[in-house]
A protein has these predicted regions:
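Short, flexible, mixed-charge acidic loops at enzyme active sites
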Residues: 72-78, 216-223, 279
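Short beta-strand-to-turn element immediately C-terminal to the catalytic PLP-Schiff-base lysine
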Residues: 118, 156-161, 194-197, 266-267, ...
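Active-site nucleotide/adenylate-binding loops and adjacent lid/helix of ATP-dependent enzymes
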Residues: 1-10, 94-187
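Hydrophobic beta-strand scaffold residues
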Residues: 38, 83-84, 112, 143, ...
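ATP-binding N-terminal substructure of ATP-dependent carboxylate-amine bond-forming enzymes
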Residues: 1-103, 107, 119-134, 306-313
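ATP-dependent carboxylate activation and anion-phosphoryl transfer catalytic cores
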Residues: 109, 236-313
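Phosphate-binding site of ATP-dependent enzymes
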Residues: 160-245, 271-273
Length: 313
């Protein structure tokens, strides 16, 4: 087959810029090794002039955070007529909104933790005391607080004491105007990469995530040695099948395509609970998706090439 002219978008201006640069470099290296002509572009005000001059067969958006995973750049790529690897902009927006994604996936039959959303304005105008009291009465004191949108665990806190909740809310509001507060579900965290093929969506082996300090934070995600991964996850075949089914259901329900990552918690009874979906999953050297791809017996570059060719056609 002939080689492709591929533009990899990485970097950008979000809080996850450095992660995006690392993902983009790994994707570019894998595709270059397969014989393709790859250009890495750090999106700026001249992005579409650069793309017009390059005239790529396909664009690979290795973007994370706002303007990448929120569908904004995907919308513009589609409007400009470029083929790209990834979901539709509308699907990316659904996955980007954690509360909306939770609602849809729950309706599709996958467990989700009880939760409350709180806007920054409401937190200020109604008084922090009354809002915090409501959260405690509805969800208890052991909760997870996170921005309603965002990735890489930025602004995410696990709270076990009522006095720690105000600080966690402020941290979440640093990254978004709305905070999502969920009841803490004890269990094992797994990440499931889902790929699309001729026969539909397929879940790759689940990656079990065991951070050294017990919290899968930004540092634990991207600093080598901070987290131990088990691939496949250390669960029975029966539970593994449940995990795969939940991940595929979430992927399909949100309209994701080609490559996604679904994060789940497996409780003590072996039941998976949906945490969030990632429309443009991280592909760095410490990300779970490449681990899952390799564990499935597929060469990383071969899969990336297949995704690029499918998008180009």
């Amino acid at each position: 087959m002939s080689s492709l002219n591929i533009a990899v978008l990485s970097g950008g201006i979000s809080h996850e810029r450095e992660v995006s640069l690392r993902s983009g470099r790994r994707v570019a290296d894998a595709l270059t090794a397969r014989g393709h002509n790859v250009t890495i572009i750090d999106p700026d005000a001249h992005l579409f002039v650069t793309l017009k001059n390059l005239n790529p067969d396909v664009v690979w958006p290795a973007l994370h955070g706002s303007s990448g995973e929120d569908g904004a750049v995907l919308d513009l790529l589609h409007a400009a007529g470029y083929n790209y690897v990834g979901p539709s902009a509308s699907a990316a927006r659904l996955a980007w909104s954690k509360p909306e994604a939770k609602t849809l996936v729950s309706r599709a039959g996958v467990r989700t933790a009880p939760s409350i959303t709180v806007a920054r304005e409401a937190f200020r105008e109604l008084g922090a005391g009354s809002v915090l009291e409501l959260i405690a009465s509805e969800l208890g004191n052991h909760v997870v607080v996170k921005p309603a949108s965002g990735g890489s665990a930025q602004g995410v806190s696990i709270v076990t004491k009522a006095e720690d909740l105000p600080r966690a809310m402020v941290d979440a509001f640093t990254y978004h105007d709305v905070a999502l507060i969920e009841k803490f579900i004890p269990g094992t965290e797994v990440a499931v990469t889902v790929t699309d093929g001729a026969s539909g969506a397929t879940a790759l082996p689940a990656v079990e995530i065991v951070p050294l300090d017990g919290v899968y934070s930004f540092e634990a995600r991207y600093n080598a040695g901070e987290t131990t991964f088990f691939v496949p996850a250390r669960v029975s075949d029966e539970i593994a099948a449940k995990i795969s089914a939940a991940a595929v259901t979430a992927h399909d329900t949100l309209g994701l395509s080609q490559l996604s990552r679904i994060d789940l918690i497996v409780d003590e009874a072996g039941e998976p609970w949906f945490l969030e979906a990632n429309a443009l999953p991280g592909l760095t050297e410490t990300s779970s998706a490449p681990l899952a791809i390799e564990a499935s017996g597929v060469d990383l570059g071969q899969l990336y090439e297949a995704l690029a060719r499918a998008a180009a056609n």
